[in-house]
């Protein structure tokens, strides 16, 4: 039994030893694998072309802030590749040592620390490389800008040499400024080489700025010089020669200082040329705009007088004829007005207006006579004559239109008289027709109101007839009377129809109401009163209202039924009183 326990104990120890061995083996293997991975990462890190990237940037000859940035990134790389690398190597050695002596837990901790160091180094390298990349790209861009400025400078030098004549008096100043730019670029190279990056950068910025300013200057000067050297002188010469020729051709200019304006423009060109020599471009641009405006104004004055002469030559005879035509028409109009005024009253001041036309035409003739000697002596500008002619056209056109209007109104007077005479005949016929119509009804009589209105209408027609038979007819009064007669007859016609219809309806209502005379006292009384109003006072509408009201009280709807029947058969003499 004791031997069995010994065997079991030995087996347990063997098993435990085996398990511990296996655990140690696997832990050692795992630590070694992590160590191998760490070695791979370390090799990969130091295989990165950081040294080459740093060397490439060194060759770029950085200056100023760029050089400071590069020094910072380079220092961080030096620290990483020395101090951090040494620390990493120490940690790797520690892992290997602990792993060899089976201190697996310490080895594992050392592996973790080494991995952390490795991760930090990888992150730092990434930051350094990105910084170097950005610095390189920035410098490449700057180099391109510098090269671009140098290319512009070279182009400007070539342009100045090839197109010397296009810069005129500004050539010397431009050449001087170009030489200054060249000196600045040379100074930049010297300072950059000698190791003064800050001042070198400032000089470079000045050189670039002056280069582009000079480029702008050299673009703007040639067109300005062309204006001052060719365009303006040629135009002023043309204006001066044209002005002298126009004076020789007897033109007169209202502008007394025309020749002085030419000299002022010439002087402005001279001053601008002096400013151009000093490359005072802003002043030259303003002056050239003013000069161009002044020259345009001079051209405009000459063209105005040339066009005015053409207008005067074309319209001179037309104006003379037009004045004669207007004068003749007005005389004829005044004769016609005098003749018409013997038969008609003129209500629109036609005679006064025609006398006003005469005064206006005579004023035009007077002004024309004042101009004639000045035109012959060539002491008046054509533009002044043109303005007078245009004013004449406006006045004469207005007179012509009013003359035609008055002439048409005179013709309308005769037409109006004829129409009014026809209306008198028509009104008299309508009045007689109404009278015959009323007589035909055989009414017992007519009310005073109706007769009064009938006589008013009759008197109005007689007034119209008398107005038409006067020695001088007032057509305004006649037209007013015509309108009143028309209104009177329309109203009389309505009153007549109302009167006749009321009388006829009263008779029918009374005839119908007789059936109730003996049975209804109110009907009997209404019949008596209605008969009195009808036969004695001839108030047919009142009689109708009286009997109609009583009948409606006895037999509702009877009044409306009889009225409807009457108007439905009003044109049937067998069924109605009419």
Swiss-Prot record:
One Gene Ontology cellular component annotation held by this UniProt entry: septin ring
Superkingdom, taxonomy of origin: Bacteria
Cytoplasmic side: 28-578
Localization per Swiss-Prot or TrEMBL: Cell membrane
Residues in compartment: Extracellular: 1-8
Protein's membrane topology: Single-pass membrane protein
UniProt record, GO biological process: division septum assembly; septin ring assembly
Coiled-coil region list: 103-165, 256-285, 394-490
UniProt keyword list: Cell cycle, Cell division, Cell membrane, Coiled coil, Membrane, Septation, Transmembrane, Transmembrane helix
Spans traversing the lipid bilayer: 9-27
InterPro entries: EzrA (IPR010379)
Entry annotated with the keyword Cell membrane: yes
Family membership noted in the UniProt record: Belongs to the EzrA family.
UniProt function note: Negative regulator of FtsZ ring formation; modulates the frequency and position of FtsZ ring formation. Inhibits FtsZ ring formation at polar sites. Interacts either with FtsZ or with one of its binding partners to promote depolymerization.
HAMAP family xref list: EzrA
Name of the molecule in the record: Septation ring formation regulator EzrA
Organism: Enterococcus faecalis (strain ATCC 700802 / V583)
